[in-house]
Amino acid sequence: MLNLIYTMYLPNFFKVFLLTAFQIIFLSNLIHAQSNCENDVIVQTVNGKLRGVIENNIYVWKGVRYAQPPIGNFRFKSPQSLNNWEGVIDADKFGAVCPQTRNIDSTVKTSEDCLFLNIWSPGISNCNRPVMVYIHGGAFYSGAGSLPIYNGSNLANKGDVVIVTINYRFGAFGFLYVD
Protein backbone atom coordinates (compact mmCIF):
# COMPACT_ATOMS: atom_id res chain seq x y z
CA MET A 1 0.00 0.00 0.00
CA LEU A 2 2.77 2.45 0.89
CA ASN A 3 4.48 1.71 -2.41
CA LEU A 4 1.23 2.64 -4.20
CA ILE A 5 1.11 5.95 -2.33
CA TYR A 6 4.73 6.74 -3.17
CA THR A 7 4.40 5.90 -6.87
CA MET A 8 0.94 7.28 -7.63
CA TYR A 9 0.07 10.00 -5.15
CA LEU A 10 3.29 11.76 -4.27
CA PRO A 11 4.54 12.67 -7.78
CA ASN A 12 1.31 14.57 -8.57
CA PHE A 13 1.22 16.01 -5.06
CA PHE A 14 4.71 17.43 -5.55
CA LYS A 15 3.68 18.92 -8.91
CA VAL A 16 0.87 20.72 -7.11
CA PHE A 17 3.28 21.77 -4.38
CA LEU A 18 5.88 23.11 -6.83
CA LEU A 19 3.26 25.03 -8.78
CA THR A 20 1.99 26.47 -5.50
CA ALA A 21 5.47 27.37 -4.32
CA PHE A 22 6.17 29.15 -7.61
CA GLN A 23 3.02 31.26 -7.22
CA ILE A 24 3.83 32.01 -3.57
CA ILE A 25 7.32 33.22 -4.38
CA PHE A 26 5.90 35.78 -6.75
CA LEU A 27 3.14 36.78 -4.35
CA SER A 28 5.64 37.28 -1.54
CA ASN A 29 7.83 39.47 -3.76
CA LEU A 30 5.11 41.99 -4.44
CA ILE A 31 5.84 44.32 -7.31
CA HIS A 32 3.40 47.02 -6.29
CA ALA A 33 0.92 47.52 -3.50
CA GLN A 34 -1.60 50.23 -2.84
CA SER A 35 -4.40 50.79 -0.39
CA ASN A 36 -7.63 52.23 -1.78
CA CYS A 37 -9.55 52.38 1.47
CA GLU A 38 -9.04 51.50 5.10
CA ASN A 39 -9.55 47.77 4.88
CA ASP A 40 -8.40 46.68 1.44
CA VAL A 41 -5.09 46.46 -0.34
CA ILE A 42 -4.28 45.77 -3.98
CA VAL A 43 -1.12 43.93 -4.99
CA GLN A 44 0.35 43.30 -8.41
CA THR A 45 1.43 39.69 -8.98
CA VAL A 46 3.01 38.20 -12.08
CA ASN A 47 -0.46 37.11 -13.23
CA GLY A 48 -2.46 40.23 -12.39
CA LYS A 49 -3.83 42.35 -9.55
CA LEU A 50 -5.42 41.02 -6.37
CA ARG A 51 -7.48 42.95 -3.84
CA GLY A 52 -7.05 41.65 -0.31
CA VAL A 53 -8.21 42.97 3.03
CA ILE A 54 -6.68 44.04 6.31
CA GLU A 55 -7.91 41.97 9.26
CA ASN A 56 -6.54 42.69 12.74
CA ASN A 57 -3.59 44.63 11.26
CA ILE A 58 -2.66 41.68 9.01
CA TYR A 59 -2.85 41.83 5.21
CA VAL A 60 -4.92 38.89 3.98
CA TRP A 61 -5.60 37.46 0.53
CA LYS A 62 -8.06 34.56 0.49
CA GLY A 63 -9.11 32.28 -2.32
CA VAL A 64 -6.15 33.09 -4.58
CA ARG A 65 -6.00 30.78 -7.57
CA TYR A 66 -2.66 29.03 -8.04
CA ALA A 67 -3.54 26.91 -11.09
CA GLN A 68 -6.14 26.64 -13.81
CA PRO A 69 -9.45 25.18 -12.58
CA PRO A 70 -9.02 21.37 -12.74
CA ILE A 71 -12.27 20.78 -14.59
CA GLY A 72 -13.25 19.56 -18.04
CA ASN A 73 -10.15 18.51 -20.01
CA PHE A 74 -7.94 19.27 -16.97
CA ARG A 75 -9.86 16.98 -14.58
CA PHE A 76 -7.31 14.14 -14.41
CA LYS A 77 -4.26 16.13 -15.48
CA SER A 78 -1.41 17.68 -13.57
CA PRO A 79 -2.11 21.25 -12.44
CA GLN A 80 -1.88 23.73 -15.30
CA SER A 81 -0.15 27.09 -14.95
CA LEU A 82 -2.36 30.03 -14.22
CA ASN A 83 -3.13 32.44 -17.07
CA ASN A 84 -2.69 36.19 -16.64
CA TRP A 85 -5.79 38.30 -16.08
CA GLU A 86 -6.87 41.90 -16.61
CA GLY A 87 -8.41 44.05 -13.92
CA VAL A 88 -8.45 43.39 -10.19
CA ILE A 89 -9.65 40.11 -8.67
CA ASP A 90 -11.17 40.24 -5.20
CA ALA A 91 -9.32 37.96 -2.79
CA ASP A 92 -11.41 38.53 0.31
CA LYS A 93 -13.25 35.18 0.60
CA PHE A 94 -11.96 31.64 0.86
CA GLY A 95 -12.22 29.58 -2.30
CA ALA A 96 -14.22 26.37 -2.57
CA VAL A 97 -13.01 23.30 -0.70
CA CYS A 98 -12.05 20.28 -2.80
CA PRO A 99 -14.60 17.42 -2.88
CA GLN A 100 -13.93 14.84 -0.19
CA THR A 101 -15.48 11.73 1.24
CA ARG A 102 -15.44 12.97 4.81
CA ASN A 103 -17.48 16.15 4.88
CA ILE A 104 -15.92 18.96 6.92
CA ASP A 105 -19.13 20.90 7.41
CA SER A 106 -22.35 20.75 5.43
CA THR A 107 -22.32 24.55 5.02
CA VAL A 108 -18.87 24.60 3.37
CA LYS A 109 -18.96 24.97 -0.42
CA THR A 110 -17.14 22.18 -2.25
CA SER A 111 -16.22 22.16 -5.92
CA GLU A 112 -13.77 20.52 -8.30
CA ASP A 113 -12.63 24.10 -8.99
CA CYS A 114 -10.74 24.28 -5.69
CA LEU A 115 -7.06 25.03 -6.30
CA PHE A 116 -6.81 28.10 -4.09
CA LEU A 117 -4.34 29.40 -1.57
CA ASN A 118 -4.66 31.89 1.29
CA ILE A 119 -2.02 34.37 2.41
CA TRP A 120 -1.51 36.28 5.67
CA SER A 121 1.26 38.89 5.84
CA PRO A 122 2.22 41.37 8.57
CA GLY A 123 3.09 43.94 5.90
CA ILE A 124 3.42 44.67 2.21
CA SER A 125 6.76 46.43 2.17
CA ASN A 126 9.53 45.18 -0.08
CA CYS A 127 11.48 43.72 2.85
CA ASN A 128 12.16 40.02 2.63
CA ARG A 129 10.17 37.94 5.10
CA PRO A 130 10.24 34.22 5.63
CA VAL A 131 7.35 32.39 3.98
CA MET A 132 5.76 29.41 5.72
CA VAL A 133 3.62 27.19 3.51
CA TYR A 134 1.29 24.97 5.51
CA ILE A 135 -0.07 21.92 3.70
CA HIS A 136 -2.94 20.59 5.78
CA GLY A 137 -3.15 16.96 6.76
CA GLY A 138 -6.08 14.68 6.09
CA ALA A 139 -4.44 11.53 4.70
CA PHE A 140 -4.99 12.74 1.13
CA TYR A 141 -8.78 12.45 1.44
CA SER A 142 -9.99 15.39 3.54
CA GLY A 143 -9.20 18.87 4.80
CA ALA A 144 -8.83 22.42 3.52
CA GLY A 145 -6.44 25.33 3.93
CA SER A 146 -9.38 27.55 4.79
CA LEU A 147 -10.37 25.78 8.01
CA PRO A 148 -10.32 28.12 11.03
CA ILE A 149 -7.60 26.07 12.69
CA TYR A 150 -5.22 27.10 9.87
CA ASN A 151 -5.87 30.85 10.13
CA GLY A 152 -2.43 32.43 9.79
CA SER A 153 -3.14 35.81 11.42
CA ASN A 154 -1.57 35.12 14.80
CA LEU A 155 1.55 33.49 13.43
CA ALA A 156 2.02 36.22 10.82
CA ASN A 157 1.69 38.86 13.52
CA LYS A 158 3.91 37.28 16.16
CA GLY A 159 6.52 35.78 13.86
CA ASP A 160 6.81 38.57 11.26
CA VAL A 161 6.35 35.87 8.65
CA VAL A 162 4.12 35.35 5.60
CA ILE A 163 1.78 32.38 6.12
CA VAL A 164 0.30 30.47 3.18
CA THR A 165 -2.26 27.65 3.28
CA ILE A 166 -3.44 25.71 0.24
CA ASN A 167 -6.25 23.52 -0.95
CA TYR A 168 -5.32 20.48 -2.99
CA ARG A 169 -7.33 17.77 -4.73
CA PHE A 170 -7.97 14.42 -3.09
CA GLY A 171 -8.44 10.84 -4.23
CA ALA A 172 -8.81 10.22 -7.95
CA PHE A 173 -9.32 13.93 -8.67
CA GLY A 174 -5.95 14.71 -7.17
CA PHE A 175 -3.81 11.71 -7.86
CA LEU A 176 -5.17 9.78 -10.84
CA TYR A 177 -3.14 11.21 -13.70
CA VAL A 178 -4.35 10.36 -17.20
CA ASP A 179 -2.16 11.46 -20.08
Can you say where each PLM-predicted feature lies in the sequence?
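Residues at the start of alpha-helices and the adjacent loop-to-helix junctions
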Residues: 12-13, 25, 44
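Hydrophobic membrane-targeting alpha-helices
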Residues: 25-33
